[in-house]
Amino acid sequence: WIHTAKSLGAKYAVLVAKHCSGFSLWPTTAHEYSIKNSPYKNGKGDIVAEFVASCRKYGIKPGIYASTTANGFLHVDNPGLVKKGSPVTQEEYNKIVETQLTELWSNYGKLFEIWFDGGVLSQQNGGADILTLIQRLQPNSIAFQGPYGYPNLIRWVGNEEGNSPYPCWATADATTSADGVQKIKGLYGNPHGNYWCPG
């Protein structure tokens, strides 16, 4: 796939390492719902490692998508809050998030882009300490809908068709850049904003 992406002129690629179901494409130590308990390579596979190796082989910058706001396996729903009936507490889920992000951001080298998709639950609102982790482990990566206060954010433009509103300013203010998520009124950015946060 990366060879094909390269032949099409791609400069970077993003792998969905963990979507909202909670299944992890790497052998995470955080829980058992991962590739290590699948028949792929007799439980010894690591698709994230294979993806990153292929990116490096073909000169493509690797990125990783890992949803933290939803996890069907652990009964966690957007914006990252544990639901009634979950096998884990909020504190335990936050530890799982921090463990998994540490694994992804420590074990596979420099990442060009990190996708959160759906934003992140801030620590002030009961979420994991994602800002400290990303600043320590991947300080140069750009982050789609990343934590408030991270300087390299890119933001949602309000739809999944790729059509941005007009005008769409590449700067934003504290209100329109929070968690990288744009409320409907903030989809345009802010021409006088202090934050570089393109959509």
Predicted regions and their residues:
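Mature catalytic domains of secreted/periplasmic carbohydrate-active enzymes
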Residues: 1-199
